[in-house]
């Protein structure tokens, strides 16, 4: 049977039917830790098996069982267990993933990759939250908010830093810049938890130790903090970003030492709070590591029977 001969298969849900999709199934498998190529191959094999058996309709539960036992039979036991874990959790609980890191370490890229793998429809950058906060807080009240994270120190009153060294001054400015943005971030988290919706929030303003401690205790609020130890790699990220955006390269390079200080500050805060720090050299490796961390946190929510979800 060729690809064009495939029979249209409907997956039955409680409220509606939907066409079987290899892409959806492959995405579910990659979220469980399977390599994308292997995920698509297995999804294609499942479709072929259903076609050969002339299956026109199949329930989500039955499809899930087929996928699970296919994984077991192909010696993917660990992935099979993670696959079921994801299915149990995603519909039952809202998941809030916070991807932090200094400018240029790649929080946006990783956040969108995770959203694609996990099927989370909403990704919010903290720069956007900052713009909203600027509309409600005047420049006279918090001038640091109207600067970049690495230039916020220039808006400090002289009395705030005249007895501090340059690094302390830079970090104080960064903290004053971050604090009002955190109000917006925490409001989004609270609303997501109340409404039962999942979201990924990414950006420089996610700083452990500055956010309310209660979020670190919640198993479905997951902190992922990225870093780049190599100065050369970090600078190359800025160069690459400047080629595809309007962000001025010179401004980043001129303030690179301050950006490094902020990066180290976020790393130290993460370690102080026993939160993961991930070296973001390879996008694929970073995404895989993030998925492993998220899955481990999910195990604390694994208290429900398998239920329907928007994934297979």
From Swiss-Prot:
Lineage top rank: taxon: Archaea
Pathway recorded for this protein: Thermoadapter biosynthesis; cyclic 2,3-diphosphoglycerate biosynthesis; cyclic 2,3-diphosphoglycerate from 2-phospho-D-glycerate: step 1/2
Species the sequence originates in: Methanococcus maripaludis (strain DSM 14266 / JCM 13030 / NBRC 101832 / S2 / LL)
Assigned protein family: Belongs to the 2-phosphoglycerate kinase family.
Catalytic activity: (2R)-2-phosphoglycerate + ATP = (2R)-2,3-bisphosphoglycerate + ADP + H(+)
Keyword Cell inner membrane: no
GO MF, one annotated term: ATP binding
Described function: Catalyzes the phosphorylation of 2-phosphoglycerate to 2,3-diphosphoglycerate. Involved in the biosynthesis of cyclic 2,3-bisphosphoglycerate, a thermoprotectant.
ATP-binding listed as a keyword: yes
Class in the EC hierarchy, top level: transferase
Protein name: 2-phosphoglycerate kinase
E.C. code: 2.7.2.16
Cofactor(s) of this protein: a divalent metal cation
């Amino acid at each position: 049977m060729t690809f064009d001969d495939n029979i249209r298969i409907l997956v039955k849900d409680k409220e509606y039917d939907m066409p079987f999709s290899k892409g959806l199934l492959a995405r579910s498998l990659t979220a469980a830790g399977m390599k994308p190529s292997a995920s698509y191959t297995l999804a294609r094999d499942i479709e072929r098996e259903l076609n050969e058996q002339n299956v026109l309709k199949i329930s989500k539960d039955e499809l899930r069982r087929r996928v699970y036992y296919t994984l077991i039979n192909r010696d993917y036991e660990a992935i099979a267990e993670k696959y079921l874990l994801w299915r149990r959790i995603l519909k039952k609980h809202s998941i809030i993933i916070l991807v932090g890191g200094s400018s240029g370490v790649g929080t946006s890229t990783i956040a969108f990759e995770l959203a694609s793998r996990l099927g989370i429809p909403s990704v919010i950058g903290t720069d956007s939250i900052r713009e909203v906060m600027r509309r409600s807080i005047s420049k006279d009240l918090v001038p640091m908010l109207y600067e970049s994270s690495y230039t916020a120190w220039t808006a400090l009153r002289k009395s705030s830093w005249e007895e501090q060294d340059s690094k302390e001054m830079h970090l104080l400015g960064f903290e004053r810049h971050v604090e009002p943005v955190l109000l917006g971030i925490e409001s989004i988290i609270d609303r997501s938890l109340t409404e039962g919706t999942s979201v990924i929030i990414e950006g420089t303003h996610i700083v452990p130790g500055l956010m309310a401690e209660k979020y670190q205790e919640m198993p479905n609020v997951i902190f992922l903090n990225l870093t780049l130890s190599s100065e050369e790699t970090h600078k190359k990220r800025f160069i690459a970003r400047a080629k595809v955006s309007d962000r001025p390269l010179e401004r980043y390079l001129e303030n690179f030492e301050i950006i490094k200080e902020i990066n180290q500050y976020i790393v130290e805060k993460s370690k102080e709070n026993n939160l993961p720090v991930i070296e973001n050299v390879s996008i694929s490796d970073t995404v895989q590591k993030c998925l492993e961390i998220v899955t481990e946190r999910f195990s604390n929510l694994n208290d429900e029977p398998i239920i329907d979800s928007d994934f297979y």
